[in-house]
């Protein structure tokens, strides 16, 4: 009886901890490498990148580790316009500048380059954003090469 109770309590603690971490940092997005200008021999699919659906939940935004060498891409593959919001943080002068409800038309693409982390990267080293609808796919490209 005690073993089951301890296991249950442990499981509940794990779920609470997982939720706390997940809701704090959101849905992580993996940076993808862009090759060039002299990449050497390129193999099949090496220049491809992957789109994923962005998070629509403000409580669990999509996040990525920002180094100052990223290009954030959006593709609205829906049939109507949808928006995205990129959350800023206070810079050294206490200024913020969220990109709020930026509209991306049906079938359109949008991009934002993060070459300066001030005002965007939070204390955990992450940038966060949400999309209005799961029809908006996102990709983060590492442009440091």
Functional labels for PLM-detected ranges:
Residues 24-40:
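Predominantly extracellular/luminal regions of secreted and cell-surface proteins
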Residues 41-67, 83-85:
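Surface-exposed ligand/attachment interfaces on beta-rich extracellular proteins
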Residues 70, 80-85, 136-139:
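Short beta-strand/loop motifs in extracellular/secreted proteins, especially
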Residues 79-95:
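Short, surface-exposed beta-strand/strand-loop-strand elements in extracellular ectodomains
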Residues 66, 73-78:
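Asparagine-centered strand-capping/turn motif at beta-strand->loop junctions
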Residues 31, 120-145:
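Terminal connector regions
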Residues 1-28:
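Sec-dependent, cleavable N-terminal signal peptides
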Residues 93-124:
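Intrinsically disordered, low-complexity Pro/Gly/Ser/Thr-rich segments with frequent PxxP/GP/PP motifs
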């Amino acid at each position: 009886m005690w073993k089951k109770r301890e296991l249950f309590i442990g499981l509940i603690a794990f779920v609470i901890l997982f939720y706390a971490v997940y809701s704090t940092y959101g849905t992580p997005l993996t940076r993808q490498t862009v090759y060039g200008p002299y990449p050497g021999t390129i193999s099949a699919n090496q220049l491809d990148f992957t789109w994923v659906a962005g998070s629509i939940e403000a409580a669990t935004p999509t996040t990525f580790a920002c180094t100052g060498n990223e290009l954030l891409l959006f593709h609205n593959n829906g049939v109507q316009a949808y928006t995205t919001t990129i959350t800023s943080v206070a810079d050294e002068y206490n200024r913020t500048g969220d990109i709020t409800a930026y509209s991306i038309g049906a079938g359109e693409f949008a991009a934002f380059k993060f070459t300066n982390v001030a005002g965007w990267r939070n204390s955990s080293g992450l940038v966060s954003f949400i999309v209005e609808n799961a029809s908006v796919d996102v990709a983060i490209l590492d442009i440091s090469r």
